[in-house]
């Protein structure tokens, strides 16, 4: 995904405020052993780009002064109550060095899960993104979590995710193996099932 930015020379609260008033958003580009670069981006274009999942989870081609560099979006600061992006941070990508970054999880086959269809189970998504490690060339836009066979009372953990070649969970996620999704039967559904069973047991067989 291509992103266009422009060099800026002024920094500080006053300069940033003037930028925002003119429809621009200040940002920085850092990393890969190069100097930090001050940039500005068109606010409206940035606002719409930020609504796309791919903008947050993939390598971006950032063009500044006619030169393109590969970056990851690392931080976004929003105004607390206005639809306004205050600042963005981009990190340069080194093709030979592994990245530590978070990618979104896409949950599949929840609606067709037997526990959901037959037992009124509810599947909760405990986390919606997970931290991985890989070379830039192997970075996936998202990871899929198949919920087709999860049973009521059971859960899916981080280590259950099928990872693409060259992608691993970061060490602390691997060690903790957190719950990704869990299937439970609501108390109301359990009570209804017990009541129906009791009615069935209480019926007198026909002579």
Swiss-Prot record:
GO molecular function: 5S rRNA binding; structural constituent of ribosome
Domain of life: Bacteria
Entry's Gene Ontology cellular component terms: cytosolic large ribosomal subunit
GO BP of this protein: translation
Keyword annotations of the record: Ribonucleoprotein, Ribosomal protein, RNA-binding, rRNA-binding
Transmembrane segments: none
Function text: This is one of the proteins that binds to the 5S RNA in the ribosome where it forms part of the central protuberance.
Family that this chain belongs to: Belongs to the bacterial ribosomal protein bL25 family. CTC subfamily.
Assembly notes: Part of the 50S ribosomal subunit; part of the 5S rRNA/L5/L18/L25 subcomplex. Contacts the 5S rRNA. Binds to the 5S rRNA independently of L5 and L18.
PANTHER family, A to Z: RIBOSOMAL PROTEIN L25/GLN-TRNA SYNTHETASE, ANTI-CODON-BINDING DOMAIN-CONTAINING PROTEIN (PTHR33284), RIBOSOMAL PROTEIN L25_GLN-TRNA SYNTHETASE, ANTI-CODON-BINDING DOMAIN-CONTAINING PROTEIN (PTHR33284:SF1)
Protein name (record): Large ribosomal subunit protein bL25
Biological classification of the source: Bacteria, Pseudomonadati, Pseudomonadota, Betaproteobacteria, Burkholderiales
């Amino acid at each position: 995904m291509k992103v266009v930015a422009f060099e800026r020379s002024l920094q500080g609260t006053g300069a940033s405020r003037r930028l925002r008033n003119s429809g621009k958003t200040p940002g920085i580009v850092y990393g890969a052993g190069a100097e930090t670069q001050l940039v500005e981006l068109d606010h409206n274009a940035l606002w719409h780009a930020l609504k796309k999942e791919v903008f947050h989870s993939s390598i971006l081609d950032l063009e500044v002064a006619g030169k393109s560099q590969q970056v990851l979006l690392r931080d976004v600061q929003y105004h607390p109550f206005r639809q306004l992006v205050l600042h963005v941070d981009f990190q340069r990508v080194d093709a030979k060095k592994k990245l530590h970054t978070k990618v979104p999880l896409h949950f599949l086959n929840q609606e067709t899960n037997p526990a959901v269809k037959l037992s009124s189970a509810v599947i909760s998504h405990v986390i919606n993104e997970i931290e991985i490690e890989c070379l830039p060339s192997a970075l996936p836009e998202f990871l899929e979590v198949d919920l087709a066979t999860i049973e009521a009372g059971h859960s899916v953990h981080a280590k259950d995710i099928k990872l693409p070649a060259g992608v691993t969970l970061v060490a602390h996620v691997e060690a903790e193996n957190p719950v990704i999704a869990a299937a439970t039967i609501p108390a109301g559904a359990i009570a209804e099932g017990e009541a129906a069973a009791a009615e069935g047991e209480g019926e007198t067989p026909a002579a």
